[in-house]
UniProtKB/Swiss-Prot annotation:
Binds 1 FAD. Binds 1 FMN. FMN binds at residues 506-510, 585-617. SUPFAM superfamilies: Cytochrome P450, Ferredoxin reductase-like, C-terminal NADP-linked domain, Flavoproteins, Riboflavin synthase domain-like. This is Self-sufficient cytochrome P450 monooxygenase CYP505E5. CDD domains: bifunctional_CYPOR (cd06206), CYP120A1 (cd11068). One of its GO terms (cellular component) is cytosol.
Length: 1050
């Protein structure tokens, strides 16, 4: 390697270094200017310490290699440790408290959890929009301050259920924000001053600590308030308080909880408010882009409430936010340091521990990546098809690797929602068209002095916007979104009959549900649902070419919230003639409210009639106090509405009404896909289940089932059972990879066996039905996991497991899933995880019912495996046994017959060949089928040779399986049973014997006699039991020939 080059940079002065080369008010701009002068890597000296800055994508790509570099906490960020200590953002590399908090919190920021926060995000965003709407289009809006209010209130509400209500105090920012801004600014100042200068700034230091204590006091108050709540919501704060680290089993300390509450409140709002501020600055500076973004929102959302699905369908908004962050990364850098001395870019030597700052405002404008127009705002470059082609680590505004922003998904959903909602609601212009962008710097950046004006779009009013937000809040969905025909929304199957419009007034959702039910019924009669919407949507919008059905109630004597405008419209007397409109009204009420009983349905019916509308049918009514509303609706439909509709509005040609299938549903059934991947599987239906053991004993179960056809089974044969994985194990996988159960996964691979190919499968189904989750990890799996972690500590531990594979991994049955939970820093893609999993295999069980005993039926006798895992933590759940234990009478499962080895069947001549059966626990299963087969022969008056059953268990009242049945068989002369009780050998029936080998000794003479008659000995059970029995028998009988001594070990 050639000699390392000297890192360029401005020449430092003695003592002060480059302090005077930097504008203290605009330090970031000064440092970015150095990048233009000195190239991709430069250094400056501040306070006697060298600070190195990387400014190109190529160097950032190297610095993001977590095998070589890790996060460094320096300068301003290190000063913030006074506030947040080892919180997620300020912790040193490898700090233990950070590890515990990170492992607890990562699952809580999964996509489903973030998606579920959308309603609370919308709540706060609507407060912002209402504020702007009420201020009017002439008001100058400090957009940065309002976005700070917005994002602070959002993070507090969504993650902690805590309302700061910042929009209700327009004069000052929340005290937490005031303290935060001071602390951030002071940290930035201290980072750029020599230590001696900081030491004499006593007043500033005192004020710094005062503000820190104020912030921690507020965080402590939030925590104390939550702890008083006996029914806390399942949010991030609840996770902080009650979560357990999957590695150490520890929870977070109170100080760590406070540190991370503060971290969320700062990091969760400060950078997002900057992102939104810069985004709207760029949009207003580029009206054609603003117009295009607004058109995307109009086309996708309209006036509906913005949903998570809408956000996924706004690619241009997504690109705008990415481009805004590229040009103005609100957290303008992050710092890493090499684990050992490294040569960066093949030119510059960086010593171990030397911090290197990734200067994002320069890196993200690298012309070699973004082209000669890299300084221009052009969102198209960030559309998915272009973004995916960028070189690695070209866009890093959220940091890197395991120390990257844990709340990225939260911030992104919030930003998308706010941009879409503002564009949906307002037209925007700058307050000062001559404004030139100025940057306000703390440890983050925001526009300084940027103000706008916002005017409501499309004739909306502040009152209308307020009412719309209230309707959304009460009904949970936008009323306007229901204006379109139901067929277009997929609420109902398409039909071609006479159209009908349904309007409802509903606060609690009852009348809305009744309307949906009636519309569904009408479709089965040959009518088409044209509209299904709240009554307020019918103002000046009642159709004349089709019947109108209204279903509504009275709320405190008044119309429901979504019927107020409609009733007011009718009451004003300004209604144009409703002549030509045909209608019917169905009203709901409760007779306890005697003064207002059916008031609004009656009022609507009368007013419409007086305005010239034609009443199709007498008004229907349902009294919730004495009847079922849906039954009353059906009665009105049959006796009043349908006859009137048939007389005046003929439906399309339709079949007669089928009461068993009123909606004419057509469907087809097929067996589960997993069944097709195994040959010869037969469907069985469970007919009986029972637990055979006492509650305080390891559980054993009996499961009886029926099937069709003759399977040519014999006593002693086996069944291969197709199981599914335990739900708790599947849940562990879903949590590990932040998947909702109904996420779809499509596998496209020629190398993956046992999985549906090129077919969407839900995550729950895939991990339940197609792969082994608890198979011990292989050596190759360990190699892959080593490659997937950046942590040297974890690598060392995994290498230790690799070196002691047989004893630590294989013998203790440690799975890949176990290892991922044990070492959360392993970053394993889900595709790699799936590729490590073998196909789910069938499990083999012995028949415990003789085929001749009950034709077309059989049974299984099995132990339910639920025991402490051999790895030392958690539970080991037997896949098939827990699946079988979950089945109930009527359940369907799948099996295939599997013959036992030929010697493990009854003798060809049961009249002349005695048998001796030796077993313990569920090893009784095949011998039960032997005995039942002999019982059938006995009932046929056929002679039988002697049969002995030696059975071991814990005790008579614990797990003496099938005691009553065996007693009946014994009384019939089919078998003689000899028992051993390991827990209660003092029982007479056990003859003092704990184990079957002991009982063999006490029955030695009988065994010798049967052996002399060419008896066959069968053994079924565990290895230890079989070895003990064999030792006794060899000592008693001598050599045991294979054809007369047959074993089946499990």
């Amino acid at each position: 390697m050639k000699d390392a080059e000297r890192i360029p940079g401005p020449k430092p002065l003695p003592v002060v270094g480059n302090l005077f080369d930097i504008d203290p008010e605009h330090s970031l701009e000064s440092i970015v200017a150095f990048a233009e002068k000195f190239g991709p890597l430069f250094q400056i000296t501040i306070n006697g310490e060298k600070q190195i800055f990387a400014t190109s994508q190529a160097l950032v790509d190297e610095l993001c290699d977590e095998l070589r570099f890790h996060k460094a906490v320096v300068t301003g960020l290190e000063i913030l440790r006074l506030l947040a200590h080892d919180g997620l953002f300020t912790a040193y590399h490898g700090e233990r408290g950070w590890g515990i908090a990170h492992r607890i919190l990562v699952p809580a920021f999964g996509p489903l959890r973030i998606r579920n926060m959308l309603d609370d995000m919308s709540d706060v965003a609507q407060q912002l929009c209402l504020k702007w709407a009420r201020q009017g289009g002439s008001t100058s809006i400090n957009i940065t301050e309002d976005f700070t209010r917005l994002t602070l209130d959002t993070i507090a509400l969504c993650t902690m259920g805590f309302r700061l209500n910042s929009f209700y105090n327009n004069e000052t920012m929340h005290p937490f924000v005031q303290s935060m801004l001071y602390v951030l600014r002071e940290a930035d100042i201290q980072a750029n001053l020599p230590g001696i200068a900081n030491s004499i700034r006593v007043s500033a230091q005192r004020r710094m600590h005062k503000n820190i204590e104020a912030m921690r006091t507020m965080a402590r108050g939030i925590i104390q308030e939550r702890r008083k709540n006996k029914n806390p919501v399942d949010d991030i704060l609840n996770t902080l308080l009650n979560g357990r680290d999957p590695v150490t089993g520890e929870g977070m300390s109170d100080d760590s909880i406070i540190d991370n509450v503060i971290t969320f409140l700062i990091a969760g709002h400060e950078t997002t408010s900057g992102l939104l501020s810069f985004t709207f600055y760029f949009l207003i500076q580029h009206p054609h882009i603003l117009k295009k973004a607004q058109e995307e929102v109009d086309e996708t959302v309209g006036l509906a409430q913005i949903s998570a699905q809408h956000l996924a369908e706004l690619p241009y908004i997504d690109a705008i936010l990415k481009e805004s962050l590229r040009l103005m990364p609100t957290a303008p850098g992050f710092t890493v340091t090499p684990k050992k001395t490294e040569v960066l870019g093949g030119r510059w030597m960086i010593n171990a521990g030397q911090p290197v700052n990734v200067l994002l405002p320069a890196c993200l404008r690298d012309q070699s990546v973004f082209g000669p127009d890299a300084d221009e705002f052009r969102p198209e470059r960030m559309l998915a098809e272009n973004f995916s082609k960028l070189p690695p680590n070209s866009w890093k505004p959220f940091g890197n690797g395991e120390r990257g922003c844990i709340g990225r998904a939260f911030a992104w959903q919030e930003a998308q929602l706010v941009v879409a909602m503002i564009l949906q609601t307002f037209d925007l212009v700058p307050d000062d068209p001559s404004y030139q962008l100025r940057i306000k710097e703390t440890l983050t950046i925001k526009p300084d002095g940027f103000r706008i004006r916002a005017t409501l779009r499309r004739g909306q009013t502040a009152t209308g916007l307020s009412r719309r937000s209230m309707l959304v809040a009460r009904d949970g969905s936008s009323e306007e979104s229901s204006n379109h025909p139901a067929e277009a929304r997929g609420d109902h199957a398409p039909a071609r009959g006479q159209p009908v419009s349904f309007f409802y007034g509903s606060n609690s959702g009852t009348c809305k549900a009744l309307a949906h039910q009636l519309a569904s019924n009408m479709m089965s009669r040959g009518y088409t649902t044209q509209k299904l919407a709240p009554l307020d949507n019918a103002v000046d919008n009642l159709p004349r070419d089709q019947p109108v059905i209204i279903l509504t109630t009275t709320y405190d004597g008044q119309p429901t919230d979504n019927a107020k405008k409609f009733v007011a419209w009718l009451e004003t007397g300004n209604v144009l003639s409703l002549q030509g409109i045909s209608y019917a009204v169905f009203g709901c009420g409760h007779h306890d409210w005697t003064q207002t009983f059916y008031r609004i349905p009656i009022l609507i019916d009368d007013l419409m009639y007086k305005a010239g509308a034609t009443r199709l049918a007498p008004r229907g009514a349902a009294n919730a106090a004495v009847s079922d509303l849906f039954s009353d609706l059906e009665a009105w439909e049959e006796t009043s509405l349908l006859p009137a509709l048939r007389e005046n509005f003929l439906p399309s040609n339709s079949t007669d009404f089928d009461p068993l299938n009123p909606h004419q549903i057509q469907l087809s059934l097929s067996k589960p896909r997993r069944v097709d991947l195994h040959k010869g599987l037969i469907e069985a239906k469970v007919t009986a289940v029972r637990v055979l053991t006492s509650p305080d004993t390891p559980e054993k179960r009996h499961l009886e089932f029926c099937f069709q056809g003759d399977l040519s089974l014999r006593p002693g044969d086996h069944l291969n059972i197709l199981p599914v994985n335990p739900p708790s194990t599947v849940s562990r996988v879903l949590a590990q990879f932040n998947l909702a159960p109904d996420y779809n996964i499509t596998v496209n691979s020629f190398n993956t066996l046992g999985l549906p190919q090129a077919t969407p499968v839900s995550a729950s189904e895939l991990f339940s039905s197609y792969v082994e989750l608890c198979q011990p990890a292989t050596r190759n799996n360990l190699k892959s996991l080593i490659a997937a972690t950046q942590s040297d500590t974890v690598k060392q531990e995994l290498n230790r497991l690799y070196d002691s594979y047989e004893f630590i991994v294989r013998d203790k049955r440690v799975s890949v899933l176990d290892l991922l939970e044990q070492f959360p820093s392993i970053s394993l893609p889900i595709a790699a995880f799936i590729s490590m999993l073998p196909a789910l295999r069938v499990r083999t069980y012995s028949l415990s019912m003789a085929p001749a005993f009950k034709p077309s039926h059989s049974s299984l006798t099995f132990s339910v495996i639920n025991e402490p895992a051999w790895r030392g933590s958690g539970q080991h759940l037997g896949v098939a046994s827990n699946y079988l234990a979950s089945l109930t009478s009527g359940s369907i499962f799948y099996f295939s017959p599997r013959p036992a080895k030929e010697t493990f069947h009854l003798p060809k001549d049961p009249s002349r060949t005695p048998i001796i059966m030796i077993c313990a626990g569920s090893g009784l299963a095949p011998f039960l089928s032997f005995i039942q087969d002999r019982m059938v022969l006995k009932q046929q008056n056929k002679p039988l040779a002697k049969a002995f059953l030696f059975f071991g268990c814990r005790g008579r009242s614990l797990d003496d399986l099938y005691h009553e049945e065996l007693s009946e068989y014994e009384a019939a002369g089919v078998v003689e049973v000899r028992r051993a009780y390991s827990k209660t050998p003092e029982f007479d029936i056990a003859k003092g014997c704990r184990y079957v080998q002991h009982r063999l000794v006490t029955e030695g003479q009988a065994i010798l006699s049967l052996w002399a008659q060419n008896a066959i000995i069968y053994v079924c059970g565990s290895t230890s039991m079989a070895k003990g029995a064999e030792a006794v028998l060899q000592n008693m009988l001598g050599p045991l020939p294979k054809e007369r001594y047959v074993t089946e070990i499990f």
